[in-house]
Amino acid sequence: MDVLKHKNDTTHTIVAEYNTRIKTYANKEKKVIFHSYSNLKGYGQEKKKNSLIEITEEERERQRKKNLYRTKMNIVDLIYHNGLKEPWQYFVTLTFNPGEVDSLDYDVVVKAMRKWIDNMQHQNPGMSYVMTPELHKSGRVHWHGVFKNVPNWNLVQARTPGGRLIKKNGLQIYNLTNYKYGYTTVSEIQNQEAVSVYVSKYIT
């Protein structure tokens, strides 16, 4: 594992392992982004803070919102620019069956997602992706993201228990049988620019 710490930065550390970016803010809150690109431009770059100066809760919250906005904009750029020459194919939501993965445990969820992504890369060597976590009000974590170059994915049309096809805004919804940890929804991407903003909104 490579641990990358920005020079003159005392507020956080970025950990790079495989295709993971983990950002720890000053309040110890962590955000994990999975993606298939070697560099997430500008991610986590902050000015040095004087550790001897006590930060008020108001200032801490202001910093958190500023960092969150920067992270969202970086994700928008990452998805948008890497979809210009070769468009993204699928928007994906992955949730966890509590009997398979304890989605209340953030570290367990990250480990399971990393394992699944590694497996998908092995099956689809040219796969590109960006995945971001969303924390539900219940405390459970699920994931949203975009993918392309996944010829060995097995997609089946999603249906209600009565057999009716499930569609959203007129588009067919699919289930991904390659995912064994829980439940999936997959849709074909129609608007490359809109999907970059759509994924970033789940980062909270």
Q: Where would I find each of the regions flagged by the language model?
A:
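Generic structural hydrophobic/aromatic packing signal, biased to beta-strands
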Residues: I14-A16, I22, V92-L94, M131, ...
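Catalytic "initiation/cleavage/transfer" segments centered on a nucleophilic residue
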Residues: E57-E86, T95-N97, G170-T204
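DNA replication initiation on ssDNA origins
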Residues: M1-L78, E86
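Conserved His + Asp/Glu catalytic blocks
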Residues: Y106, P125-V130, H136-V141, F147-T204
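Histidine (H) residue identity feature
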Residues: H6, H12, H35, H81, ...
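Signature for HUH/AEP ssDNA processing cores
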Residues: R62-S138
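Phenylalanine-focused residue identity feature
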Residues: F34, W88-F91, F96, F147, ...
